[in-house]
Amino acid sequence: MATEQQIATLSEYDFVVAIDASGSMGTEDIKGGRSRWAFMQETAESFCRDLSKIDADGLGLVVFSGTNVESFDGVDVSKISEVFKQRSPRGSTPLAEALSAALKLAGKSDKKDFIIVFTDGVPDDKDAAAKVIRDASNKQETDDALTILFVQVGYDTDAGRYLKMLDDDLKGCKFDIVDAKTIEEAEKFASTVDLVIEAIND
């Protein structure tokens, strides 16, 4: 259960969830024979359910694949479920555009911002995605004003290396605003709140 201090910290943030709907999300390599897409639905719904108790006006949501990046504001768990029912994995991974859309949603209030990106593969725009993060970092006034947490779904080693580079080795940033976790690392946390607090403090 979240402590009063944790809840007080997270109440200072708006939250945006970005969901990778690229073709590789259909890969069935999650424990129990599940697809990455099915597993991510379960994980995203849980994340939204937990954080909607803190962010009462609803979460921001970005869904991205191929040339299609969609944004939704003020979503709840039912909207997350609807998004998954209406889509199936296809196309490539336009991460830079997705991050730009997430930052636009996040910047609608004076609160600090937390963006969580569920993704499984290397984006088709690696350098552009890194530039979006770098530019966002350099606009911040404090190191906790913006946090971007990547959670890698699946086991693509190239994707893992890329996300860890964004976390540990991205050059030219005013602040380190990125944290990256594998799904196994994320699941070790007792709660969504603990995971988010750790990413903010990282």
State where each predicted segment sits.
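Acidic, low-complexity intrinsically disordered regions
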Residues: 1-202
